[in-house]
Curated annotation (Swiss-Prot):
<feature type="repeat" description="ANK 5">
    <location>
        <begin position="272"/>
        <end position="302"/>
    </location>
</feature>
<dbReference type="Pfam" id="PF09372">
    <property type="entry name" value="PRANC"/>
</dbReference>
<keyword id="KW-0040">ANK repeat</keyword>
<feature type="repeat" description="ANK 10">
    <location>
        <begin position="441"/>
        <end position="471"/>
    </location>
</feature>
<dbReference type="InterPro" id="IPR018272">
    <property type="entry name" value="PRANC_domain"/>
</dbReference>
<feature type="repeat" description="ANK 7">
    <location>
        <begin position="340"/>
        <end position="370"/>
    </location>
</feature>
<feature type="repeat" description="ANK 3">
    <location>
        <begin position="177"/>
        <end position="206"/>
    </location>
</feature>
<feature type="repeat" description="ANK 1">
    <location>
        <begin position="40"/>
        <end position="69"/>
    </location>
</feature>
<feature type="repeat" description="ANK 4">
    <location>
        <begin position="210"/>
        <end position="239"/>
    </location>
</feature>
<feature type="repeat" description="ANK 9">
    <location>
        <begin position="407"/>
        <end position="437"/>
    </location>
</feature>
<feature type="repeat" description="ANK 8">
    <location>
        <begin position="374"/>
        <end position="403"/>
    </location>
</feature>
<dbReference type="Pfam" id="PF00023">
    <property type="entry name" value="Ank"/>
</dbReference>
<dbReference type="InterPro" id="IPR036770">
    <property type="entry name" value="Ankyrin_rpt-contain_sf"/>
</dbReference>
<feature type="repeat" description="ANK 11">
    <location>
        <begin position="473"/>
        <end position="502"/>
    </location>
</feature>
<protein>
    <recommendedName>
        <fullName>Putative ankyrin repeat protein FPV244</fullName>
    </recommendedName>
</protein>
<dbReference type="InterPro" id="IPR002110">
    <property type="entry name" value="Ankyrin_rpt"/>
</dbReference>
<feature type="repeat" description="ANK 6">
    <location>
        <begin position="306"/>
        <end position="336"/>
    </location>
</feature>
Length: 668
């Protein structure tokens, strides 16, 4: 019989069957082969203890009193085993039972641990191995019953533990990890077991191989009664351990206050060089603890392994401006940077809801133009997250709107990297950002907008505000060449005067996006259509098109469609082709309300439909802005000579003004 065979019988057998199996169990033959990493003990006494088979334990000890001194492969004494709650999932997997049973036990243990009923998992394990139903729903509906099971198991554990202690078991015996039974009892938050072990002389100052004390294990249990028991029963407890730090790290306010009032050190440091204050400032629920830690003289400028100070972490979490003021008044360096030269203000600038934190830091001396390791200032952090509120706040306090970072560029470049750049880009432009600023690669914001496939309204906003549609960067790339994957942007760029500088636009668009490819050829066809009477000029791209059958077939299709468009008369002076070839919005807005234009279905034109649609939309938008501006000026200048001018003269005057400036008039 192997250890796992005996274990199965321990789970499902009756008293007689279990004792009979133990009698036939040959420890010397099979125990030596037991893998040390397995969760199943190889001794009968430890198996019985692990499964809380109390009657079996008593019988075995009665037959052989020396069994209480037997240890398992991890040097766990019998007292260790009764104090440890076994990991039922490791056990059930080791037993290689049916997958359905494994899943049932897994879900049941999740529910029980959620309700802090870990001890009841032992009952579930035995039920599952015995073949009894332990479904998720059954366990979920039996929480009260499981609480009774837990109480019964804990009572049995106390009886066995006291019996072992009375028979002389070493209360401070250490396992391979140098843990004593009270370490495990404290970790479980088993207050009654802790009190029992303390009454028999358990040493709470024994440190394990991972440098943890009994109290630190108890702190992780978050059981305040267990923690009080350890503190109250041992006057010689070491108060310089990490107990207070761990309680704060666990955001356990009750335990933190108890340990603080008990005099535990506030200057402890963990392996990451964090102090209790580092953790306290990150949890809103612990805000009342911050002034208490400061009263004890904790180092307010202590840096962890990343170079972060408590103020830095508080700014990063963006809450409690009162405690931010308190920290700074107590000497916290408002500009203390981490190992990457990121300051508290950089961190606070990441979210709109941190506005109060940003203002507090700025009012108390934060450098609004501090630079990190990539030369990014706080406004770069706000821009890349499209935080308009923070952008405006930083600008109000003197942030450099043209600050240039090493890699990406200016604030406007960063804004285009965000997920929703429209409002932040608009804000920056309205506040004077240069739309043609260049980074070290000579790329403009328009280059980035094309690369990031920004929405059409963002592209148009840049172009309407003077972005150079033909700017070339250090890699000899212009916006149109970068945007060829995105035909919607290509259409806009061509409409705003993008030049077809070389054959790359043809070959790259053919490989990237067929719609872009058609737009390019259609645009060349328009140029040829406009210049048909200029014999001296030869378009080199046209020669390339004529030399390739694929290119040529699309060219001919565009040419025929353009002829069809030119046959549609708008009035006696203009045909529909004016909306294809002209970029003069002051001309087109006079034509856009023509009934023929309103009836045009742009989807009918395969090659020029999108171009027509864009042109009509821009003309319509121009007309609306002009009319709205005229009405607004009529209100403002009601008593002046302006009101006496004919409407068409007013429009003619306003046509000299761009859309951006007209919008400012409309918004007055």
């Amino acid at each position: 019989m192997w250890p796992d065979d005996l274990y199965r019988i321990m789970c499902r057998g009756n008293y007689i069957e279990i004792l009979s199996a133990i009698t036939n169990y040959n420890l010397h033959k099979h125990g030596a082969n037991q893998c040390e990493n397995e969760s199943i003990p190889f001794t009968a006494i430890h198996q019985a203890l692990q499964l809380r088979q109390i009657d079996i334990v008593k019988e075995l000890i009665q037959q052989n009193p020396k069994l209480i001194y037997v240890t398992d492969h991890r040097r766990n004494s019998t007292l260790h085993t009764i104090c440890i709650t076994p990991n039922v999932m490791d056990i059930v997997i080791s037993l290689t039972v049916d997958c359905d049973i494994i899943l049932d036990i897994k879900y049941a243990s999740i529910i029980l641990n959620k309700h802090k009923l870990g001890e009841a998992c032992i009952h579930v394990l035995k039920e599952g191995i015995s073949g009894n139903e332990i479904s998720y729903n059954k366990i979920n509906k039996s929480i009260e019953y499981m609480k009774l099971i837990k109480e019964r198991i804990q009572q049995d554990e106390l009886l066995i533990a006291e019996m072992l202690l009375k028979k002389g078991i070493d209360v401070n015996a250490k396992d391979v990890y140098c843990r004593t039974p009270i370490h495990y009892a404290a970790e479980r938050g088993n207050t009654k077991m802790v009190n029992l072990l303390l009454s028999y002389g358990a040493d709470v100052n024994i440190i394990t191989l991972d440098d943890l004390s009994v109290l630190e294990y108890a702190v992780d249990s978050k059981n305040i009664d267990t923690i009080k028991a350890i503190i109250d029963n041992r006057s010689n407890i070491n108060k310089n351990d990490l107990s207070l730090l761990k309680a704060i790290r666990n955001t356990d306010l009750e335990t933190s206050l108890l340990l603080y009032d008990s005099g535990f050190s506030v200057n402890s440091i963990d392996v990451y060089k964090n102090t209790p204050l580092h953790y306290a400032v990150q949890a809103p629920s612990l805000s009342r603890l911050v002034p208490k830690l400061l009263e004890r003289g904790i180092d307010v400028n202590a840096k962890n392994i990343k170079g972060e100070t408590p103020l830095y972490l508080m700014a990063k979490n963006g809450y409690d401006t009162e405690n931010i003021r308190t920290l700074i008044m107590r000497g916290a360096d408002v500009n203390a940077a981490d190992s990457l030269y990121i300051t508290p203000l950089h961190q606070a600038s990441t979210l709109d809801r941190y506005k109060d934190t940003v203002i507090t830091l700025l009012e108390l001396g934060a450098n609004v133009n501090a630079r990190d390791y990539c030369d990014k200032t706080p406004i770069h952090y706000a821009a890349v997250r499209n935080n308009v509120v923070i952008i405006n706040t930083l600008l109000d306090y003197g942030a450099d709107i043209e600050a240039l970072s090493q890699k990406i560029g200016t604030v406007l470049h960063f804004a285009l990297y965000g997920t929703n750049p429209y409002m932040s880009v608009k804000t920056l432009i309205d506040r004077g950002a240069n739309v043609n600023s260049k980074n070290k690669y000579l790329s403009t914001p328009l280059h980035y907008a094309c690369k990031k496939n920004c929405k059409p309204e963002v592209i148009k906003m840049l172009l309407d505000n003077g972005a150079d549609v033909n700017a070339i960067n250090i890699r000899n790339q212009y916006p149109l060449l970068i945007a060829l994957e995105y035909h919607g942007i290509v259409n806009i760029l061509l409409h705003y005067g993008a030049e077809l500088r070389d054959s790359r636009v043809l070959h790259k668009s053919l490989n990237s996006n067929m719609f872009s490819f058609r737009y390019i050829i259609a645009h060349i066809c328009i140029q040829d259509f406009i210049r048909h009477d200029i014999r001296s000029e030869v378009n080199p791209l046209r020669e390339i098109i004529q030399s390739d059958d694929t290119f040529k077939s699309i060219w001919l299709s565009c040419k025929e469609e353009l002829k069809d468009i030119s046959k549609i008369r708008i009035n006696m002076f203009y045909s529909l082709d004016i909306f294809v070839i002209s970029k003069n919005m002051n001309l087109l807005h006079h034509l856009v309300n023509n009934p023929i234009i309103k009836e045009i279905n742009t989807y009918y034109f395969y090659n020029y439909g999108d171009r027509l649609k864009t042109s009509i939309s821009l003309a319509s938008n121009r007309h609306k802005i002009l009319e709205k501006s005229r009405s607004k000026l009529d209100e403002i200048l009601d008593s002046s000579g302006w009101s006496k001018l004919p409407p068409d003269i007013k429009l003619s005057i306003l046509e000299f003004i761009g859309n951006t400036e007209l919008r400012k008039i409309c918004n007055r």
